[in-house]
Amino acid sequence: MHHCKRYRSPEPDPYLSYRWKRRRSYSREHEGRLRYPSRREPPPRRSRSRSHDRLPYQRRYRERRDSDTYRCEERSPSFGEDYYGPSRSRHRRRSRERGPYRTRKHAHHCHKRRTRSCSSASSRSQQSSKRSSRSVEDDKEGHLVCRIGDWLQERYEIVGNLGEGTFGKVVECLDHARGKSQVALKIIRNVGKYREAARLEINVLKKIKEKDKENKFLCVLMSDWFNFHGHMCIAFELLGKNTFEFLKENNFQPYPLPHVRHMAYQLCHALRFLHENQLTHTDLKPENILFVNSEFETLYNEHKSCEEKSVKNTSIRVADFGSATFDHEHHTTIVATRHYRPPEVILELGWAQPCDVWSIGCILFEYYRGFTLFQTHENREHLVMMEKILGPIPSHMIHRTRKQKYFYKGGLVWDENSSDGRYVKENCKPLKSYMLQDSLEHVQLFDLMRRMLEFDPAQRITLAEALLHPFFAGLTPEERSFHTSRNPSR
């Protein structure tokens, strides 16, 4: 069996006009071609686009692009990577696709509107004063035009670019009100719907900060927020790379089992805190989980005859609360990025906290193997893959769903002789067949994942139960502690 190392792209929102979806080509010309490259070939650049055709992988697996919708019905953007960027270097920028959604006031390519906020403090350099005297500009899509050396709120000095997405951009700043501490400043587009979405996220972040006064629950904390000439801005601490970016830069070599165990424990700890406070994240994925410090050492793997990066510190933080939902709030029909989306969401049966548990199960598999468990972009195929890997969908869920078009006489309608059918048959095996070793700790990990991947959310393990699973018995006392040197008031 030959499996890929995950090449995917953000899920399009079927309800929003500014997201898109290309149908896969089923032409004979491409039928039968492998979705994944040979292991002997260098790994292709990954794509997050939802197009999933049968074209050669060189075309299909393009550089990841972000199609953020920022909490509008369904959000698949990877804010974790956009908050802080792939590393702390100040020269990086990533290619993004921006949605075509724009307003009349941003019809012109670029326009000047206001005077940029500046400081009169004598300690500031003459150069900074000159830069701050420029008028504030938005580009045609409402992104704030900002440059290295600009100041915001007479406090934040921009020193680098961290990333850009449909929601806005993230810049690295020095916070002069906090001793020039480094922060990641997310600057939202000057568009009404994104402004409102940012206010919703700020509300969630305020609640988290209120409930986590001692900063023990491993969620990224907001240090400040403000409205800068129509741009909602949120300041966060500057962290390391997200866990997907590290995996990608490590040639998709999976994380060692001890690393998987420690990250899994922290994930369960953080999400249990959210769930106990009636909050569901709804968009858990490796991009939204960041290392506190992503420094690494390079080791030689004799078994694979190659060098591998090993992160020195596996402490993580959970990020991106833009689509987090309180129990009392309206629950949109579709949540979660495709590859981490549970069956109850696909079948439109309603969702709650167990939605996050399913996502964690998928994430742990990806850490362990280096590729996604469900490599698909279409509902019917996704359900078929679930059955191939996890067994049959419970009959009571089939009877309750409105999506009867996927079923006939209690079973999924699926042509195993089609191109998709052959792919699923060849690449999707029972979950335990993906186990790399049959030692006790590997068996325990797969038992935990299987309990997280129960079809019925009512039968799915809770995170309080997961923290007591035997898989975590191998943690050191230091790994079980959640001390942090961060200052919550920063």
Curated annotation (Swiss-Prot):
Maturation and modification: Autophosphorylates on all three types of residues.
GO biological processes: protein phosphorylation; regulation of RNA splicing
InterPro entries given in the database record: CLK_kinases, Kinase-like_dom_sf, Prot_kinase_dom, Protein_kinase_ATP_BS, Ser/Thr_kinase_AS
Comp. bias intervals (Basic residues): 88-116
Chain positions recorded as ATP binding sites: 162-170, 186
UniProt lineage: Eukaryota, Metazoa, Chordata, Craniata, Vertebrata
Molecular-function annotations in GO: ATP binding; identical protein binding; protein serine kinase activity; protein serine/threonine kinase activity; protein serine/threonine/tyrosine kinase activity; protein tyrosine kinase activity; RNA binding
Annotated active site: 283
Residue stretches making up the Protein kinase domain: 156-472
Primary enzyme class: transferase
Recorded superkingdom: Eukaryota
Entries under CDD domains matching the protein: PKc_CLK3
Tissue: Endothelial cells.
Transmembrane region(s): none
Phosphotyrosine modified-residue sites: 7
Gene name for this UniProt entry: CLK3
EC code(s) of this entry: 2.7.12.1
Modified residues (Phosphoserine): 9, 49, 51, 67, 76, 78, 135
Protein name: Dual specificity protein kinase CLK3
Biased composition (Low complexity): 117-130
